[in-house]
Amino acid sequence: MIRSGAGTEQLARQLSVAVVEDNPHIRQLLQDEIHDEGHRMIGFSSAEDFLATYGEESIDLILLDLMLPGMDGLSCLQQLKINQSQDGCPRVVIVTALDDAEKRRIALDNGAEEYNLKPDLFLRLPDLLQSETTATEEARRHP
């Protein structure tokens, strides 16, 4: 687990990325991409599993599917924002197959920073991880 100020410069650049995705194939593809970029992925197949362990590990970025069994991604996002600590919630990026303007608006209004369609996410992921790495390093240097 990587915490603020811990480890070497190389470790400081490694992100912990939570992926909340019920499709095991997509979760594995994301894990491969995240690992290839030098980061760590923690996978969850449901919003309930994610929320039950949220806060136990340091997480820098959350990739959250909208269509999940049980609690959906929007409800999970709302719960995250309600329960966030004073330090704030990590950046949340919605990952979905739903190209739905209303869902996009609701997600962004509820604190998601981005709304990505799944096919596009794989093209966007390296840049997304790099920008988050830069932001995380800056936050660690200037707490």
Language-model-detected regions and their locations in the chain:
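Non-catalytic signal-transmission and effector/linker regions of two-component phosphorelay proteins
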Residues: 1-18, 24, 123-143
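Two-component/phosphorelay signaling modules centered on CheY-like receiver
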Residues: 24-42
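Residue-level signal for the "D+5" position in two-component response regulator receiver
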Residues: 43, 68-71, 109
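Acidic, metal-coordinating helix/loop segments flanking the phosphotransfer/catalytic sites
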Residues: 43-61
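Acidic catalytic/metal-coordinating carboxylates
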Residues: 46, 72-78
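His-Asp phosphorelay/catalytic-motif detector in bacterial-type signaling
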Residues: 58-60, 85-91
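Active-site residues of response regulator receiver
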Residues: 65, 96
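Alpha4 helix (beta4-alpha4-beta5 surface) of REC/receiver domains from two-component response regulators
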Residues: 75, 99-116
